[in-house]
UniProtKB/Swiss-Prot annotation:
Keywords for the protein's UniProt record, in alphabetical order: Acetylcholine receptor inhibiting toxin, Disulfide bond, Ion channel impairing toxin, Neurotoxin, Postsynaptic neurotoxin, Secreted, Signal, Toxin
Organism from which the protein derives: Pseudonaja textilis (Eastern brown snake)
Additional information: Has the length of long neurotoxins, but only 4 disulfide bonds, as short neurotoxins.
Keyword Metal-binding: no
Species lineage: Eukaryota, Metazoa, Chordata, Craniata, Vertebrata
Tissues expressed in: Expressed by the venom gland.
Cell compartments where the protein resides: Secreted
Protein name: Long neurotoxin 1
Length: 89
């Protein structure tokens, strides 16, 4: 009985720890589990000679654009940074 109780406690702790991880989109529509401490998803967009460029990922703090032509948005829920042409889940 003690073994069963201990097993349930361990499984609960592991599940609670996994549930704390944020999921953000990276390239294309590939979801990625962020590292501990990365509590934001971001989308960075800018234009270059080839058209509109899009970068997405995880961050501990919202990235600050280094140039005025770069636009950054941040959010804090799972899969909240889809490609701009897609709707969030």
């Amino acid at each position: 009985m003690k073994t069963l109780l201990l097993t349930l406690v361990v499984v609960t702790i592991v599940c609670l720890d996994l549930g704390d991880s944020l999921i953000c989109y990276l390239d294309f529509s590939v979801p990625h589990t962020c590292a501990p401490g990365e509590k934001l998803c971001y989308t960075r967009t800018w234009n270059d000679g080839r058209g509109t460029r899009i970068e997405r990922g995880c961050a501990a703090t919202c990235p600050i654009p280094k140039k005025p032509e770069i636009h950054v948005t941040c959010c804090s829920t799972d899969r909240c940074n889809p490609h701009p042409k897609q709707k969030p889940h």
